[in-house]
Amino acid sequence: MFVPLVHRCFHNLIKILEYIEPFIRDEINTDEDAYLWMKALFEDMNPIDKDSDAFRYPFKIEIRKDEVWGDKQYTIKKFFEGQKHINLIAFANKMEIIFDILCSYYENKKKRYEEYKKYNTVFLEEGGEYYCQSVIGYDYSKAFYGPMVKGYSESAEYLGDLIIGDSKLKETYFFPMCYLYRNALELELKQIWFEECAFGFQERCKKLSKSKHSFEKLWNMINEDLIRHSQGEGDKSVITYAERYILQINALDSSSSVFRYPVNKYGRYHFVKNKYVDARNVGEFFKEISEFLQCVDMMMDDHNQCLADMAAEYADYY
């Protein structure tokens, strides 16, 4: 059952729901209206995020062939067209209701629901109090990666603090913490490549598209520019250590799925045997790499700005 599910449905929630519906029909029959409400919300979500990328990355890269020469041309497409002020309270409450419904199906519980009746089936509903809104749909800018890096890394750090404060929470929050940190690191590597490295737009898009989720590929893409911006042997030594850490993560999770799902696309567990790890140490490991990459981005941005200012000043003489 699992392999056909993955290959037919991937991340598409509507397809997944329709695939499993025959197996949870008894639970659905207990409150079919709640099921139909949830399904309608998934249908509204699907055009926005059927590939599960819209909230992980700031944009996607589209490829088309030049009609005359047949060459591939790369363009950036935003996930959200037009600015929207999202009602975060309504969004969070809808998600909580959906989780409750799905958990009852998973646990074979036959329950009825009332809370969903307070909400419509619009996925990203606008409105609400001013301080309870999130604005999405900004035009692409050079600093577009920054807020996503901050959001993922600070969320991971928050879960890490919960684990340290209460060891009973390790089983619950360890993998989410690792996934959030891993995605933050991927965003940081892509930010350095796309915003600071000395390549043209088409080349940056092409290599970014091919790198997918591989830390090794992303690191190799930025390494030459990073060394060029580094200052002295001390910096190069730090870069060497950072490279070892980054390649360790890549060896464990090159596809960004090990911390995201318990099994791979063939239904096999990522970790077959029990492993005892130091959760605090793992959190600090991720955090230090994240801070290193953020410093790299700031250093390269500062250098590039200085070079641009010098070039502009030099051009004034001619």
Where on the chain are the PLM-derived regions?
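Domain-scale activation on soluble regions of proteins
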Residues: 2-318
